[in-house]
From Swiss-Prot:
It comes from the Viruses. This is Non-structural protein 7b. InterPro entries: Corona_6B_7B. Keywords: Signal. Residues 1-15 form the signal peptide. It comes from Canine coronavirus (strain K378) (CCoV).
Amino acid sequence: MKFLIFVLCLSLVNGYGIRRSIQEYDPKESHEHPTMTWELLEKFVGSTLYITTNQILSLPLGAEIYCDEIEGFPCSWPGYKAYAYNHIDYHFDLSSPFYSFVDKFYISLGDREEKIHLRVVGATPKDKRLTVGCRTSFSVNLPIGTQIYHDKDMQHLVEGRHLECAHRVYFVKYCPSHSHGYCFKDKLKVYDLKRVKSRKCFEKINQQQKSEL
């Protein structure tokens, strides 16, 4: 009898511990921080909100963040979403390379046609990400999965991610999962800084690169 009571008590304690553990890690558990209300969102309808740094944008249930189609391809917001009991936390991590290629989003207000525009301005600009100055050979700092080609027809793939430091143009193809089939195609410009002595010299090299394209 004592053994049965002990087992029963132990089961109750373990059950409480498991239930407590689930409550502590339940993403829908109530937590408090500034959250945009529907009344506040109404004030920004038709306007543009700017995202300038890593941050969490908390929206009431029913309001969601989307990005516009990219040349007919659907586009989904690339960040992490945390669901709470009365709102959704949208985590903006501006180190994501996706924001270098797509910087315009919008907040959908349920079934309404009106929307609130969002513009990410704190991420690394695409031109800066695709322009490299070097003094020695280097590894390319581009998103995982980006393909680099020697030619504009994208037939001759560069092996690996290590490039020689020389004035030249490569061609890149970036196909993020959030663009659902669409691939960004652009140019990666490399400049050997040991040979750039002045702005005039830089402009001459730049002109030569354009003529080669």
